[in-house]
Regions:
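Conserved hydrophobic helix-helix packing surfaces used for dimerization/oligomerization
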Residues: 14-16, 153, 215
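ATP-dependent carboxylate/phosphate-activation module, predominantly the ATP-grasp catalytic core
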Residues: 198-203, 207-266, 270, 277, ...
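A glycine-rich beta-turn/hairpin centered on an aromatic-Pro dipeptide
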Residues: 321-364
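A conserved helix-loop-beta module that forms one wall/lid of the active-site cleft
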Residues: 56, 98-165
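A short glycine-rich, hydrophobically flanked beta-strand micro-motif that places a catalytic Asp/Glu
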Residues: 194, 205, 267-279, 324, ...
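Conserved ATP-binding module of the ATP-grasp superfamily
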Residues: 130-132, 152-154, 167-200, 230-240, ...
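ATP-binding N-terminal substructure of ATP-dependent carboxylate-amine bond-forming enzymes
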Residues: 1-110, 320, 334, 371-388, ...
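A structural supersecondary motif
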Residues: 271, 359-378
Length: 436
């Protein structure tokens, strides 16, 4: 007999969600579906915030006004605080939970260890986790001092996210201008430079659930970036499950990664590790001690009955991270195939959107998350970041061939037209990259 997951005890609980943008929309939808009363707050009006438009109640307290949030928690008799994958609001969640005495899956100290790319490199080296060479900015300040640098190199904000401020450079001159760009994006003004692992644009993503210190790998997905040739748009274009690299990763890298996560102090929550597979090694590129923007629980729920979004909400409201039954389900995954298509569009004002209604009628399409609407403007400043994505289409099937037929239909069907009549969805994923 299947054990209770504890979700039924959450009905009527009151959850405060920080941030009303698309980043928290799925959090609000999920919490409402669990019977939870949801209040959404930030400093913008309801008309400007999609998540506020579906919440039970709203407030206009800024998400970094900790004192104001504590007062709101007392006034509304809030039982827990959470947010979506926004790293800015996760930090605010950590602080307000501490101030209000509410549960939080991590502390500010542990969060900072995980979010800082320089810190991550140090932990990788300490535990034998493969990682590419790192170079100090000083190496590029003097002509000739970079003779030992293995180009291309990637310049990143040390504390960045969402692919913002990242540039791939092939010479010293371009590095210097890229450093300025990354410094502007970094909250701390710090920049991180490493050898770019050029493997054709494939990322191996491994996800772990952490329950009272027990670290359990539960999902491995391949992601392919949008622009592997020019390397100007290092954002996701396509993801698939299962990954044919899972067995190799488990045999060669998993044990060291688990030791690293344990040493970082993680006790509960969900974490994803992004690696670049090349020549039998998995080079750790980034990690997130949080839910991901990919919303992969839309796969894991039908696959194995696990939903890390619901788990994190349950924990925020005083419940357990994982039940024993949920841990056991990891080994009972069904034979399913999954794909997620992300659709980067060009800058401009959207006049017309085509194909989304037809796409939603496809029985293999389990979710279409649309970030822009007709009349919205896509700024040039978001090109090359996750803000360039128009939509995220999740597809699932028991048949691999059927899955890829549906993916191809989605690629061919979606159309976004600007006010001058031009197609904005130009960089469509080439399934030939994965042999389909």
């Amino acid at each position: 007999m299947e054990q209770s997951n504890g979700y039924e005890t959450l009905a009527g609980k009151r959850l405060l969600v920080l941030g009303g943008t698309h980043a928290s929309l799925d959090t609000v939808k999920t919490a409402i579906s669990m019977g939870i009363h949801v209040t959404v707050t930030d400093d913008a009006p309801v008309s400007k915030r999609v998540a506020k438009q579906i919440a039970h109640s709203v407030a206009e307290v800024s998400t970094n006004d900790i004192d104001g949030l504590v007062d709101l928690i007392k006034k509304e008799k809030i039982d827990g605080v959470f947010c979506g994958p926004s790293e800015f609001n996760i930090q605010n969640t950590i602080r307000v939970c501490k101030a209000a005495g509410l549960p939080c899956y991590t502390t500010e100290e542990i969060w900072n260890r995980c979010a800082d790319k320089t810190s991550l490199k140090q932990y990788c080296r300490k535990h034998g986790v493969s990682t590419s060479e790192e170079y100090p900015v000083s190496v590029f300040l003097t002509e000739g001092a970079d003779e030992d640098v293995k180009y291309p190199v990637a310049i990143k904000p040390a504390d960045g996210c969402s692919s913002k401020g990242i540039t791939v450079c092939y010479d010293r001159a371009s590095v210097l201008s890229a450093v300025e760009k990354a410094e502007k994006v970094s909250a701390s003004g710090r920049v991180f430079i490493e050898r770019y692992v050029d493997n054709g644009g494939r990322i191996f993503n491994i996800r772990y659930l952490i329950n009272d210190g027990e670290i359990c790998p539960y999902l491995a997905i391949d992601t392919f970036i949008s622009d592997p040739i020019n390397k100007e748009r290092l954002i996701s274009a396509f993801s698939r499950y299962p990954s044919d690299l899972y067995g190799q990763y488990m045999a060669t890298a998993d044990a060291d990664v688990r030791k690293m996560l344990r040493d970082m102090g993680m006790k509960n929550g969900t974490v994803f590790i992004q690696t670049l597979p090349l020549d039998g090694k998995f080079y750790c590129m980034d990690m997130g001690y949080r839910l991901s923007g990919g919303l992969f629980y839309k796969l894991t729920e039908p696959l194995m009955g696990i939903n890390d979004m619901k788990m994190m909400i349950r924990y925020a409201l005083g419940g357990v991270m994982c039940t024993p039954d949920e841990i056991e389900r990891i080994g009972r995954a069904k034979d399913l195939y999954f794909a997620q298509l992300t659709t980067p569009i060009e800058a401009g004002e959207i006049a017309e959107i085509r194909g989304i209604t037809a796409l939603k009628q496809d029985p293999t399409v389990i979710d279409v998350l649309q970030y822009y609407r007709e009349g919205d403007c896509v700024s040039q400043s978001v090109i090359g970041t996750l803000g360039q994505h128009f939509s995220r289409v999740s597809i699932i099937s028991e048949d691999k061939d059927e899955l890829y037929r549906s993916v191809r239909r989605a690629i061919d069907t979606i159309s976004v037209i600007d006010t001058e009549g031009n197609e904005m969805y130009l960089q469509r994923f080439d399934l030939g990259r994965i042999g389909v």
